[in-house]
Amino acid sequence: MAAVWREGDDLLLRLYIQPKASRDSIVGLHGEELKVAITAPPIDGKANAHLSKYLAKLCKVAKGSVVIEKGELGRHKQVRILQPSQIPAEITALIE
């Protein structure tokens, strides 16, 4: 299964999250998932909120347009970005 794919106008990402990183970044592929490092700790939903904000900024959409579909409580997540205005080059290269 692909790490990144389109479904209509939406972008879907299978992610592996690394919380408490030194900076926010898209690291690259981690098995069949896209590894994303974020600075927020995995406490009380802070990492999920920070991930949504980071992906919204990258794709130039509102935070509400980033939906965590699976993996709310784990490092492995599936995220849907509704009608992204922009897709970063690191993600575009992986779209199938």
Swiss-Prot record:
Pfam family, one: DUF167
Coiled-coil residues: none
Source organism per UniProt: Vibrio cholerae serotype O1 (strain ATCC 39541 / Classical Ogawa 395 / O395)
Protein name: UPF0235 protein VC0395_A0010/VC395_0502
Gene3D superfamilies the record matches: YggU-like
HAMAP family (UniProt xref): UPF0235 (MF_00634)
GO CC annotations, alphabetized: cytoplasm
InterPro entries: DUF167, YggU-like_sf
Signal peptide: none
Listed SUPFAM superfamilies: YggU-like
Domain of life assignment: Bacteria
NCBIfam families according to UniProt: DUF167 family protein (TIGR00251), PRK05090.1 (NF003466)
Family: Belongs to the UPF0235 family.
